[in-house]
A protein has these predicted regions:
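Feature captures the catalytic ectodomains and active-site-proximal regions of enzymes
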Residues: 1-505
Length: 505
């Protein structure tokens, strides 16, 4: 075969057995529905050990795109760090020990920053507990936790429970809670520096709600209609009503989020660059991250450095002398580039990139169409030329709007994707393209929890795989790692030995 291929990733679009909780089922998606009757289709697993995560752990976009591009199961940082905590090898890591040594020798505070939940997408509370235990073993004084509350990869009002759990743990281990800030502010990834500024001011300048009872302050926010994602800085105070710990010049900071995309901006503002328009000034800090957030960052100590994955789909297509396009809006741009390329930032030879800005709204329920129509128009213009041999396209709507927990908006998001998918697929067919319609993980198919509350998290459900091709009529079930071998099979390119998964044709 020598086909041209579009990989269309419907982010957050899973398969559920319970239609009443599904935005997809309740949306009018006549085109995607019609594909199941006309073309070969199967399902893909995107969770747990199928993508290199611990058993039962929901997948996510970073993990999904990495497995899709790699053509193999990529073992993830969550599993790696879980093992290091359990087997106590984390306490032997030089970068961590050096951080504590610096703080002790210079009589400086240690600030532990990160998402405090068991969501397992960006971090895990057990990793923080492991770090606290090592600090206790190393007899480090003045250890402070600045917790970022989740409410997105777990229940929207579970933050109080995690904070109580952490505070109980610190009584036996070491450390004190210094602040709680919602991830909306502390973990932006869309260059909304006005959000990062709010987190920065809480951490550095002591701007926020001051309290001695943090769980009561969280409950007040719940009562006012705010969920964990959106807490503005809550600062725990000392006897003189001053914040227990602000980040000062010369302090040690350890950012324990292992997923890289939502740790970059705050790290940048604290340690790399001044942002005068937001009145944020970088500090001279001993700064450590648990994984490598950005190769361009200077003077960052990294505990676990990832090796780039060799012979990913993009690299193999490039070496075969073929042309490829990566296209997404801002929210998913790193996923179709950096993650899909196995941790490589630079484009391969013959790779072009199309980026459309995500709309500047507070939350995507306010504009569930996002930038899907702009992506569609831009891509179809290229498809008409029929010069690209491979296209990797991401529609972010199902995931990003699914995360809001608002059913009506998620329905609108699904309907938008249906319209855009039709335009792209039909333009592709007209110009000789086979389309693989898949998802990277589930989300918007489960908008309601069993207790009736909104579900904002990913799921462990399988996802669809539809092969839109007039000639090929059968397809096997598989995992995300099987997609790259399937694409190489369609394109008539030899599969490299590093790709250990199989074509599903």
């Amino acid at each position: 075969m020598n086909k041209k291929v579009i990989l269309m990733i419907l982010d957050g679009w899973g398969i559920t057995q319970d239609p009443k909780v599904s935005a997809i089922y309740n949306a009018k998606t006549p085109y995607i529905n019609s594909l199941y009757n006309k073309y070969a289709h199967a399902s893909l697993r995107t969770d747990g050990e199928h993508v290199g995560l611990p058993e039962g752990q929901m997948g996510n976009s970073e993990v999904g795109h990495m497995n899709l591009g790699a053509g193999r199961i990529v073992y993830q940082n969550l599993a790696r760090i879980n093992k290091a905590v359990k087997e106590k090898t984390l306490g032997k890591e030089k970068a961590l020990l050096d951080t504590f040594k610096y703080a002790k020798e210079n009589n400086k505070k240690v600030h532990l920053l990160g998402l405090v939940s068991d969501g397992g997408i960006h971090s895990h509370i057990n990793h923080l507990k492991g770090i606290l235990d090592i600090a206790k073993e190393q007899e480090v004084a003045n250890v402070f936790v600045h917790a970022f509350s989740d409410g997105r990869d777990c229940d929207p009002k579970s933050g109080g429970k995690f904070i109580n759990d952490l505070q109980d743990y610190m009584k036996e281990s070491t450390g004190e809670l210094a602040s709680v800030t919602g991830r909306y502010y502390a973990m932006d990834r869309d260059n909304r520096w006005e959000r990062i500024k709010i987190a920065y001011d809480g951490l550095v300048n002591g701007v926020g709600t001051r309290t001695k009872d943090v769980v009561a302050a969280i409950q007040q926010n719940y009562d006012a209609g705010l969920t964990d994602e959106f807490h503005k800085p809550i600062l725990i105070t000392d006897e003189e009503n001053q914040p227990k710990a602000q980040i000062k010049e010369g302090d040690a900071v350890l950012f324990f989020n292992y997923r890289t995309d939502r740790g970059r901006e705050l790290t940048n503002a604290l340690s790399q660059n001044d942002f005068p328009e937001e009145e944020m000034k970088k500090l001279d800090l001993y700064f450590t991250t648990i994984t490598l957030y950005d190769e361009s960052f200077q003077n960052i100590n990294v505990i676990y450095k990832n090796d780039n994955i060799k012979n990913t789909l993009g690299e193999v297509i490039s070496r075969a002398g073929k042309k490829q396009i990566r296209i997404a809006e801002t929210e998913k741009y790193p996923h179709v580039t950096f993650f899909f390329s196995g941790g490589q930032e630079a484009p391969f030879n013959g790779e072009s990139r199309i980026l459309k800005n995500s709309p500047k709204v507070a939350t995507y329920d306010l504009q569930p169409e996002m930038s899907a129509y702009e992506l569609t128009d831009a891509l179809c213009e290229d498809l008409e030329k029929a010069t690209a041999d491979f296209v990797c396209l991401n529609f972010a709507n199902g995931d990003m709007v699914g995360h809001t927990g608002i059913m009506e908006a998620a329905i609108k998001a699904c309907e938008t994707v249906d319209t855009c998918a039709k335009t792209v697929i039909e333009t592709g067919l007209k110009n000789g393209y086979t389309t693989l319609l898949i998802a990277d993980h589930g989300n918007c198919e489960t908008m309601i929890n069993p207790d009736g509350s909104p579900n904002t998290a990913h799921t462990t459900n399988p996802v669809p795989f539809v092969l839109i091709d007039e000639d090929l009529k059968s397809l096997k079930n598989g995992i995300l790692g099987d997609i790259a071998p399937t694409i190489l099979d369609l394109m008539g390119i030899e599969q490299p030995s590093e790709m250990t998964q199989k074509s599903l044709l």
